[in-house]
């Protein structure tokens, strides 16, 4: 038995491919995205993992990724909790815009600040700090208790919701977490100590 938490960013979405701000909008996966999600499941299977429960967001790109992984593991009917607490960062007025068009409208420097600062939200949206303010309490109250009961837990979510979770798990500074890129469909395996601190981290790259 081990206290195991696996984080996976959803496979490539149609809007990732088009370079659009996605946030809480709900585009589907590309063919590549479906393949990435299935490959993530295959790598987890090769690592000998089976899950006790899965969590995902209220957005279909994460839900489909989660299901592909469970299908590859032979666990298609596993209990899966869907909650908007795990949704991507809300990009507000930027949602649906091409990133180049956003730079033309607001200026490259301003868009860079919205994308890469920790606590400056775009108009009508969330900062990474805001995203963490909903993700981390949800993790502590809902997900972590399963891990500490020596269960193996899957979380299939989004680049920024997972970045906020990783920041708190690893005790990273805003500067450190903002430098981290999470590739689509790449599982990150955490083993936790009994006191909930991180014992080890492994990235299952292709």
Swiss-Prot record:
Enzyme class: isomerase
Residues that coordinate or bind substrate: 9-16, 22-23, 61, 88-91, 99, 115-116, 159-160
Catalytic activity, as annotated: (2R)-2-phosphoglycerate = (2R)-3-phosphoglycerate
PROSITE patterns per UniProt: PG_MUTASE
Keyword Lyase among record annotations: no
Family: Belongs to the phosphoglycerate mutase family. BPG-dependent PGAM subfamily.
Subunit structure and binding partners: Homodimer.
Protein name: 2,3-bisphosphoglycerate-dependent phosphoglycerate mutase
Organism for this UniProt entry: Brucella melitensis biotype 2 (strain ATCC 23457)
Species lineage: Bacteria, Pseudomonadati, Pseudomonadota, Alphaproteobacteria, Hyphomicrobiales
């Amino acid at each position: 038995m081990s206290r195991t938490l696996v984080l996976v960013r959803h496979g490539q979405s149609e809007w990732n491919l088009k370079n659009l701000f996605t946030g809480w909008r709900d585009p589907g996966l590309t063919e590549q995205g479906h393949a990435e999600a299935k490959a993530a499941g295959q790598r987890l299977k090769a690592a000998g993992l089976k899950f006790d429960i899965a969590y995902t967001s209220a957005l279909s790109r994460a839900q489909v990724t989660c299901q592909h992984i469970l299908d590859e593991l032979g666990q298609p009917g596993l209990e899966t909790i869907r909650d908007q607490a795990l949704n991507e960062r809300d990009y507000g007025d930027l949602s649906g815009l091409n990133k180049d068009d956003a730079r033309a409208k607001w200026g490259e420097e301003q868009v860079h600040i919205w994308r890469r600062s920790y606590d400056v939200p775009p108009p009508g949206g969330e900062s990474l700090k805001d995203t963490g303010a909903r993700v981390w309490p949800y993790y502590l109250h809902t997900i972590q208790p399963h891990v500490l009961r020596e269960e193996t837990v899957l979380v299939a979510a989004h680049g920024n919701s997972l970045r906020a979770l990783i920041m708190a798990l690893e005790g990273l500074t805003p500067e450190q977490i903002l430098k981290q890129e999470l590739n689509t469909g790449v599982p990150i395996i955490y083993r936790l100590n009994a006191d909930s601190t991180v014992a080890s981290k492994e990235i299952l790259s292709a």
